[in-house]
Amino acid sequence: MKKKILLMMSLISVFFAWQLTQAKQVLAEGKVKVVTTFYPVYEFTKGVIGNDGDVFMLMKAGTEPHDFEPSTKDIKKIQDADAFVYMDDNMETWVSDVKKSLTSKKVTIVKGTGNMLLVAGAGHDHHHEDADKKHEHNKHSEEGHNHAFDPHVWLSPYRSITVVENIRDSLSKAYPEKAENFKANAATYIEKLKELDKDYTAALSDAKQKSFVTQHAAFGYMALDYGLNQISINGVTPDAEPSAKRIATLSKYVKKYGIKYIYFEENASSKVAKTLAKEAGVKAAVLSPLEGLTEKEMKAGQDYFTVMRKNLETLRLTTDVAGKEILPEKDTTKTVYNGYFKDKEVKDRQLSDWSGSWQSVYPYLQDGTLDQVWDYKAKKSKGKMTAAEYKDYYTTGYKTDVEQIKINGKKKTMTFVRNGEKKTFTYTYAGKEILTYPKGNRGVRFMFEAKEADAGEFKYVQFSDHAIAPEKAKHFHLYWGGDSQEKLHKELEHWPTYYGSDLSGREIAQEINAH
């Protein structure tokens, strides 16, 4: 009897082992069903999946990805898929709601941008100029604003490589049995992207004209990565004839800078093109944002690479012709945030403007969380400083051992936390000081003085947060010392910086990078 039981147990073990092997084999041999959002995501995902899955695209050509809202049928497709791949929450803004509605936990959700930091969307950049070695308060980012981040990373071959790597890594983790194939497919696709990146670099690195004018500000990453300046204009669309007033101002702008082409996202109607040519003396050309290809175009052999090479060819209509530097129609850099204001606009502020719990950004600089920021800054400086030089510069500025500060506006107290040890003092407002920096911009220091005689190095403190009147701070630079307010006014190299304690390091890095 005992032998029969042992035999039965052995047979059962063999059966289950066989079933497990079969299940793994089915998973390895079966195809993964992947739903993607719009064309670049579809293209990149197919490049990774290869023959190991079926890839579907929700948005067809002609659909505006920015305005798309999924139907019940679309959500059902996502629900029934093995994986769902999208670009970024700033592009497909509806994805966060769809995630919440998914009842199936088997769907692997992949964000193409992964942990990439993005730049601010059009109209949200504060245009900081931070290549100077002196801290002029137009060098740092503001935290906590509801910025629209620019998601158009796929229009830069250089950044598209990272998107493909993110898709590869996420799908490989979800389907380890297919990881080897995914990695091999991705490697082949990435090689093609690297070749495209080389083509863009070769054509644009020595461009005779670095600026191009576009109606659709989608090419910021492409411009950044290849040393160009994207200048967007308002009041001109490919399908609506501009007003007489707009034509008049545009004509002056075009003549002032010798602009030959304005780039549109699609073919401008013949009427619009003729009006621009006749009245403003400028031609219309197409730079595709690659948000969709028709079935006909794909069957004809068009894909990401053919369209991107066509974009490069069209862009060279401008970049291959020498001309004066083209500036935006309006100077958006001279803002209060950047240090341009009138004395009468500066108002007194109370400690309550900085109430809350704050963390130093210095640890995030040390652990590499901010490294992407330095890379971006180096590219924005166009060779004036390297990423390593930026990191050194901010290391000096951010350095502090006061890791946390808690401010109670009602009690008018500040608690400084150093190595876990807390020191709390009560402060009174001591006025404001307007400082003028070498480039001509200015900043305001709001001064406070501790009541306690034993406050020591925390006797005098000064806040600077790019604001000049009462408002709730989103981040701040803090100066402190035990000698005098006047001595602190001279401190321009060292500015410990603090953000809300509820923010992650990546969230802080993203906000810094958006400016």
From Swiss-Prot:
Any one GO molecular-function label of the UniProt entry: zinc ion binding
Entry similarity comment: Belongs to the bacterial solute-binding protein 9 family.
Location of the region described as Disordered in the Swiss-Prot/TrEMBL record: 125-148
Binding site for Zn(2+): H66, H152, H216, E291
Domain description: The His-rich loop facilitates the closure of the zinc binding site and is required for zinc acquisition.
Region feature (His-rich loop): 129-148
PANTHER family assigned to the protein according to its UniProt record, in alphabetical order: HIGH-AFFINITY ZINC UPTAKE SYSTEM PROTEIN ZNUA, HIGH-AFFINITY ZINC UPTAKE SYSTEM PROTEIN ZNUA-RELATED
Disulfide bridges in this chain: none
Function: Part of the ATP-binding cassette (ABC) transport system AdcABC involved in zinc import. Binds zinc with high affinity and specificity and delivers it to the membrane permease for translocation into the cytoplasm.
CDD domains: AdcA
Annotated signal peptide: 1-28
Protein name per Swiss-Prot or TrEMBL: Zinc-binding protein AdcA
Keywords: Ion transport, Metal-binding, Signal, Transport, Zinc, Zinc transport
Domain of life: Bacteria
Protein's GO biological process: cell adhesion; zinc ion transport
InterPro entries cross-referenced by the UniProt entry: AdhesinB, Bact_metal-bind_prot9, Calycin, Lipoprotein_PsaA-like, ZinT_dom, ZnuA-like
